[in-house]
């Protein structure tokens, strides 16, 4: 039986749709087990320990610079310390603990977190992606589980309808998502700079002759080593992260208890929030400005959510409440107690408050902790960009998977070079942690605010929470983050401009790439080749059937791409087995190999002059790794034979079940076709790719011509080529040039 495809997407009977899928019972595949999803308490404790090294390096090293950034001009009143300590404690409780640990972590996408995970979660419940490549079979992927809005809660259905019908809403959600990604990239630039510089600055306590410039160059040397080692990944040294950060937490907690006992235990009254009110009454605008330093105590909080895929919710909740919060709270309280007696040392509080015998051990662990914090932030930045790349939101770059044991550990050489150069430049330009902190805070709070807005959509659309709770969530966290952001923006001219400029450039690149990507897809979709024209092309006298298997890649998941007629015109030959191949990334973290492919027959041997034409969509999640070309082709052809077999079984089941001769003929034809596929595979596989030159159509605006003809073209020519991303051997590659005017 031959299922013809007329080029345009058309509704199909349910039974036919089921048959057209490669795996008839894909919906029966059990949901993939996430790493650390559930399990025994022993396993949870193990994951909680491991998470200490991966998740908390950044927030755990914040005590190195929070007080110096909060009081850049010194402490004017002794009780200001109590007010700031109270702000620090309640900021730690409100945002990392209440918001992230006990609310946001539950909005994960099959165990994965982060800004893109929230966006993909929303996009599965409402069609907000701008590329129309949704297919009915996608819902059968086990990780694609969704809960339709309840009929009892019309609000969720109303929100869904508004999101799907409003281009402005789609663009707004996409914009804040790429803004969050851009800010995380800024975070990846500033975290190494501020963490390493603040840790190295402590050496001046024992070597006072060192100038600040020399400290900066020592920091630059460490940064150079850090970024040079990224290509090796964290797999080989990752096992040391948790012990080192655990030792760090024990040290800062112990030193904090020591300072509390020796200097002023009464600083514990900071748990009374009235001291926050007194602090603002006493200092007014200066107290508001100081919030930009206070917020640095929660840098790295987003990592708890972004790195969720490697752990589980219980593990992170346990490690935060039992290890991180007590340790850093004791550290901040101890520093405040020390500063009550020695307020003149606020510029270097951390190292001045360390008992003399512990200085060198703490200094060494601080350097290691700063490097680990930087490494964790960089790994997270690479992972987020990898997700953006798979969803068509970032230009093609090389993604190197650095671990065979742990998924999600990737390294992107081009991005590593740019972030490394930017981090070194920031360190050399700003010189002090106080100046870098002005820029750092903007990245941190902007990501917090974006998560709050996306979480509000999740609550409305997916969780279907009662409105009073949603209003309370948005008001509490939205107001707090607005206050912090407004404070940081007051330092725009003192370094706050840096992440804005960085993010604007990165957003412009991402938006340009995605805009042309969408326009190109629509251009191809509007010009799909009808099945009748395909059959006519194959029937031409000058078109020869050549041995082997041809895989023609395009982004279309429905219809024959317009590059095919051009290929036949230029090279009047078609392979005996020809597959129109599409690589599609679903808004889910992973797709099981058993659910990878969807096949449809385009033209059978009887109608195609001996050619066998198929369409295939290979589906991947945004954390999945593409196989090498050889392995991919072998797996593809193996599953193609399964499809041929299932097609014959389905054809027999629709006919007269008593006609044994017909069944035998159908089975014999299927066996013959499988033999043909094997024989042609032995003759070799050729990969064909359309090399599209995209230009702005005549009459386009000046801005569109600049974006398409210059910016996009520059990106496309200077970044990774498509065949390299698919690991296609050059001796098996054939490119077909074509021009699209969009």
From Swiss-Prot:
The keyword Chloroplast is assigned to this record: no
Chain positions carrying an annotated carbohydrate: 259
InterPro entries, A to Z: K+_transporter, K_trans_C, K_trans_N
One of the record's GO molecular function terms: potassium ion transmembrane transporter activity
Signal peptide: none
Family, as annotated: Belongs to the HAK/KUP transporter (TC 2.A.72.3) family.
Descriptive protein name: Potassium transporter 19
